[in-house]
Amino acid sequence: DIVLHSATKYLGGHNDVLAGAIMTNDAAIYDKLFYNLNTTGPVLSPFDSYLLLRGLKTLALRMERSTQNAQEVVVFLKQSPAVKEVLYPGKGGMISFKVANQDKIPTIINSLKVFTFAESLGGVESLITYPTTQTHADIPGDVRASYGLTDDLLRLSIGIEAAQDLIADLENALSL
């Protein structure tokens, strides 16, 4: 078994480091990975290492606040008539939701004041992404749809701002 983890997101926590981790519980796989890593030398710079360690110091606090905020935002989204479906497993700060009227997506995104329209996820600030035009824009629409990435889907990365500010921002944008 191999686990790949993006340290760029929550572990770094401030959208300023690019890093990852590879883990395995198999000695033979570890030996192969270690050989490749040793011969190719993909290591973090000292500064990136510092940034990652800095982020780890506040990880528990950031995750607690992000999760708490996300749960409050989910309650709001589930009650909003502008939202037809909320996709949230119950933990963490990542929320996906489908809007009732996808033609309003540009208005929603452009009306947000607290959320930032950006692709990086897992930082201290709250972000909104539109996979159709951002992260998955190069994937044909029918393929995206087969993965559940429909054109009415928006993704939120919930940060550590006050939950009531996030909800008010979404409420305003979704009401337009």
Name these PLM-found stretches:
Residues 71-119, 141-145:
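Conserved small-domain helix->loop->beta segment predominantly found in fold-type I
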Residues 42, 75, 116, 122-124, ...:
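Positively charged, small/polar-rich N-terminal and surface patches that mediate targeting and assembly
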Residues 62, 128-176:
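PLP-dependent enzyme catalytic core of the Aspartate aminotransferase-like
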Residues 1-82, 86-87:
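Conserved PLP-enzyme active-site core in the AAT-like
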Residues 52-61, 93-100, 155-159:
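Short, well-ordered beta-strand elements within core beta-sheets of diverse protein domains
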Residues 40-41, 112-122, 173-176:
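A common structural junction motif
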